[in-house]
Amino acid sequence: MAEASSANLGSGCEEKRHEGSSSESVPPGTTISRVKLLDTMVDTFLQKLVAAGSYQRFTDCYKCFYQLQPAMTQQIYDKFIAQLQTSIREEISDIKEEGNLEAVLNALDKIVEEGKVRKEPAWRPSGIPEKDLHSVMAPYFLQQRDTLRRHVQKQEAENQQLADAVLAGRRQVEELQLQVQAQQQAWQALHREQRELVAVLREPE
């Protein structure tokens, strides 16, 4: 029974492999996207993994249990293989999402396609290291300089806004101080007038 199950599993893998190869067949010269190649590599890996962990090897590891419960052993093996494939596919999907691999691979495909239709000759070293280094590094440093300059200008503008806000706050404080002084002087003048009025009222006739 183990041999029959192993044979059935192997034939199933072979059928899937032939189906995959027929569906994945493309005309010569056709470029396959890197995302498609990655998915094909994952499928091939899973097929080889299932082939390496055949049912025959599984039953060899659990001979006693297989002799007692052959049907249960088959069910456990099928469930184990299915969960293993699902777990691997989910892990690879998480890696693709975390690394944004599909976007990166599609960008690489786009760069390659643009390079095919590019008319100007590709860059080649001149044989003079200093010249080659300058031609490569100079644009990079110029770009970095422009980036830093924009950051500096942005920071200066923010600093100027903060300085203007501080000056406006100082003016408000000064105005409040003047208002307080004016109110204090007015209160003192009113207090003097009240005292003078009280003194006048207390004078004998």
Curated annotation (Swiss-Prot):
Gene that produces this protein: PMF1
InterPro entries in the cross-refs: PMF1/Nnf1 (IPR007128)
Protein name: Polyamine-modulated factor 1
Region annotated Disordered, chain positions: 1-30
Entry keyword annotation includes Phosphoprotein: no
Record-level GO cellular component terms: cytosol; Golgi apparatus; intracellular membrane-bounded organelle; kinetochore; MIS12/MIND type complex; nucleoplasm; nucleus; outer kinetochore
Oligomeric form and interacting partners: Component of the MIS12 complex composed of MIS12, DSN1, NSL1 and PMF1. Interacts with COPS7A. Interacts via its coiled-coil domain with the leucine-zipper domain of NFE2L2. The interaction with NFE2L2 is required for the transcriptional regulation of SSAT.
A molecular function GO annotation: transcription coactivator activity
Species assigned in the record: Homo sapiens
Induction (record text): By polyamine analogs in analog-sensitive H157 cells.
Location(s) in or outside the cell: Nucleus; Chromosome, Centromere, Kinetochore
Lineage: Eukaryota, Metazoa, Chordata, Craniata, Vertebrata
Primary site of residence: nucleus
Function per UniProt: Part of the MIS12 complex which is required for normal chromosome alignment and segregation and kinetochore formation during mitosis. May act as a cotranscription partner of NFE2L2 involved in regulation of polyamine-induced transcription of SSAT.
GO BP annotations listed: attachment of spindle microtubules to kinetochore; cell division; chromosome segregation; transcription by RNA polymerase II
Key words of the record: Activator, Cell cycle, Cell division, Centromere, Chromosome, Chromosome partition, Coiled coil, Kinetochore, Mitosis, Nucleus, Transcription, Transcription regulation
Pfam family, one: Nnf1
